[in-house]
UniProtKB/Swiss-Prot annotation:
Principal EC category: hydrolase
Function field: Converts holo-ACP to apo-ACP by hydrolytic cleavage of the phosphopantetheine prosthetic group from ACP.
EC number of the protein: 3.1.4.14
Organism encoding this protein: Yersinia enterocolitica serotype O:8 / biotype 1B (strain NCTC 13174 / 8081)
Gene that this sequence comes from: acpH
Domain of life: Bacteria
Any Gene Ontology biological process: fatty acid biosynthetic process
Family assignment from sequence similarity: Belongs to the AcpH family.
Protein name (record): Acyl carrier protein phosphodiesterase
């Protein structure tokens, strides 16, 4: 899962949005560095990542990537799941529009930015004003996201090429999303993540 899905599942679970978004920027045990609520959000994010990566359907999705891109497929899929979520938001959350959800999330996170790592503050300087969470619905933006990640981290250069496999296998990958994500939503609502 990427930013949007983590925020979405956190909302369903009544978990800290800040903690869930911040988690990738916190190494080791966050106890003592952040409030218990934020720590719980960080830990939920980590559980979601482990859960997602070990799902048989997600392992099946990795099989749609050619050998050159299979190593980065988990990262590519995290971004792609956000694409499907953003594109189908109204079906999954008919009572709250995506722009309203994003505004709510932003209001929960931005007041706490001064207490967060500089890299996280830098992310937030782009995430909200450039409307990334809404733009995830656009497939060309997904290509741009993967290219940007590849440019920033040379070891992940294969991310840029992995977009070709998304285009080649878009429909079966979307079917896999629908096969697992609604169940994760239910687990979040039931506080089972």
């Amino acid at each position: 899962m990427n930013f949007l899905a983590h925020l979405h599942l956190a909302t369903l679970a009544d978990s800290s949005l800040l903690g869930n978004l911040l988690a990738d920027f916190v190494r080791g045990n966050p106890q003592g560095e952040y409030s218990p609520e934020i720590v719980a959000g960080i830990m939920m994010h980590r559980r979601v990542d482990v859960m997602t990566d070990t799902l048989p359907l997600v392992k099946e999705a990795r099989g749609y990537f050619s050998a050159d891109y299979r190593r980065v497929a988990p990262i590519t899929l995290d971004v792609l799941w956000d694409h499907f979520l953003s594109r189908n938001w109204d079906k999954l959350m008919p009572d709250c529009s995506l722009p309203d959800f994003i505004e709510h999330a932003q209001c929960q996170i931005l007041p706490h930015l001064p207490l967060t790592p500089a890299r996280f503050q830098n992310l937030n300087a782009y995430l909200w004003p450039e409307r990334w969470l809404e733009r995830y619905a656009e497939l060309p933006f997904i290509a741009d996201v993967l290219q940007g990640m590849a440019n920033r981290r040379p070891k992940l250069a294969a991310l840029a090429g992995s977009f070709h496999d998304i285009e080649q296998h878009y429909q079966p990958l979307e079917q896999l999303f629908w096969a697992f994500y609604p169940a994760m939503m239910s687990q979040a609502q039931d506080k089972q993540i």
